[in-house]
Amino acid sequence: MRISRREKRKQWIAGAFGVCAAVVADQLTKELAYRNLKLSGKGFATLIPGVLELRYLENRGAAFGMLQNRLPLFILFAAAVSLAAVICYIRVPDSRRYLALRVCMAGLTAGAVGNLIDRIFRGYVIDFIYISLIHFPIFNVADICVSLSAGLLLILMLFVYRDGELEIWTRSGSQDGKDEKKG
């Protein structure tokens, strides 16, 4: 079932607002980490002993610190992911059924843009959230956006959408998620 123009406009505004809010939250928390952890000389703060800490880290690599010092590659990759997510957002059929898919694309865009801003203006990504309980790699708000969106996207693809239903990336014309038959 297609949505009304008004509903579509609301989804677009909500998506744009969500991306902007997530990017602002990411950049603000990174700036707070920079000022309160790095500049103060502390480097870390314990929030919940044995569970959650804030640890300042300048990540010059990819996810979880892999592939260090490949800045041009990471800038290109983050820009490509952002562009691909926006294109997918645009191509998602106008139906409430695909709202979760739009949320995934918005989250991927926000996360990619948040870390892209760091790479362009700092030359590295600020990571600061550390779950000491499980010794998980240090991460940031943008990483949360990407990870949650990718996880939800995987769940949607495996359990919600049927085979062929997500051909929206390769097909032109159809806006309701159903194959168009010609001839």
Name the predicted role of every residue range.
Residues 1-183:
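Alpha-helical transmembrane bundles and membrane-interface segments of multipass inner-membrane proteins
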